[in-house]
């Protein structure tokens, strides 16, 4: 797999390449889950050009060097990846989309923006907490207690896998657990975002001069889509697609619908 790094350590790994000039940069959610979580999304996308899996420095398996502070330039360091390649379309899942909307310097540097199961502000978080209280998962609660007592990678992985019923529809639970079980979790990235971003976030820009794809699973229980009802986000450049029968990773339950949405988005980009 071809791998490139920006000067600050943003990692871009080439997933696939078809004929065409576009460069698709896929940014994972979490944070701390790693771009490996978007492998199935990249597999589902039948788009022209190159698809790259992107990890911020210190996120997922993109580990920082000893003594460095990989989070010092989060999330603005995303600009470096956009400047490293021509004809870039950024796609951010969940918190990844929030990081993109917190980086106004991207304006004028990208040809399109895909926002996948994400939100324009942090109002999604109390709604998520309320959902977990309405529909508790005892195994998740036990895993949280174990991780807090002993914050190992094994305990963190167990915790996330125990949340699968919130993330996936029943028919996709086996695939969802397998996905969550093989991710390179990064506790430091999770802790940084919780302390410095997740509870303060509000979008710092909204592009109106490039195509925007807003895509979400119609049964996503993790990130509420309610805040998108604000009129400033109902601009003519937006392609909005609810993916039927899908949760927080809609390409797992319904890859065909996700593929079709990206095909329509590509038509908008290429004119």
Predicted regions and their residues:
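Flexible "cap/lid" loop of the alpha/beta hydrolase fold
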Residues: 113-147, 190
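Active-site loop/oxyanion-hole signature of alpha/beta-hydrolase fold enzymes
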Residues: 52, 56-91, 95, 260
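Conserved alpha/beta-hydrolase catalytic His-Asp/Glu region
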Residues: 148-195
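Conserved hydrolase catalytic core segment
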Residues: 86-127
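Conserved HGGG/HGGXW glycine-rich cap/lid loop of the alpha/beta-hydrolase fold
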Residues: 8-64
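Catalytic histidine-centered segment of alpha/beta-hydrolase-like enzymes
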Residues: 243-259
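Conserved serine/cysteine hydrolase catalytic core
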Residues: 178-233
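Acidic beta-to-alpha connecting loop that harbors the catalytic carboxylate
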Residues: 30, 218-220, 245-247
